[in-house]
């Protein structure tokens, strides 16, 4: 049984599909839902870390995803801002450290030979995760 669901978003249509699915799953199962944004950081060795998104952009991404989750029946969605050098590693590490038992990720609608391949973040999360991973598309 699922108790805690983590769903990353980057504001794309593909991640919105994952958010909607995760919200519906949480509503049906009674699981707690957390929506996260992974703010990928670059640099750092001798200089400051440079983040992909500003704090305001992270807040806007989370606000939009939480609103979407609410439209799909998920109450009391937790907001999580993860800073990591790599998106998949940040998602998996946060999920492990905080007791999540299900991760829902989005991936693009691919055609032809590329349909055999998942998006790199989704594939990396599936390969590294300690828990169930659902890929929504």
Kindly give the residue locations of the regions a language model identified.
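A short acidic, glycine-rich active-site loop
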Residues: 50-61
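Small/aliphatic-rich secondary-structure junction motif
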Residues: 3-52, 70-72, 76-77
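Structural beta-alpha unit
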Residues: 70-103
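Short secondary-structure boundary segments
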Residues: 37-39, 102, 106-108, 137
């Amino acid at each position: 049984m699922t108790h805690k669901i983590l769903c990353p978003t980057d504001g794309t249509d593909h991640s919105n599909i994952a958010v909607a699915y995760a919200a519906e799953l949480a509503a049906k199962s009674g699981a707690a839902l957390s929506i996260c944004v992974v703010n990928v950081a670059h640099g750092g060795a001798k200089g400051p870390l440079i983040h992909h998104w500003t704090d305001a952009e992270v807040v806007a991404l989370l606000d939009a995803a939480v609103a979407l989750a609410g439209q799909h029946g998920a109450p009391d969605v937790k907001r999580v801002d993860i800073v990591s050098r790599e998106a998949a590693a940040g998602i998996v590490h946060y999920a492990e450290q905080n007791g999540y038992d299900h991760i829902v990720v989005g991936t693009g609608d691919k055609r032809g030979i590329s349909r055999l391949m998942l998006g790199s973040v989704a594939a990396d999360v599936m390969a590294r995760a300690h828990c169930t991973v659902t890929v929504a598309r």
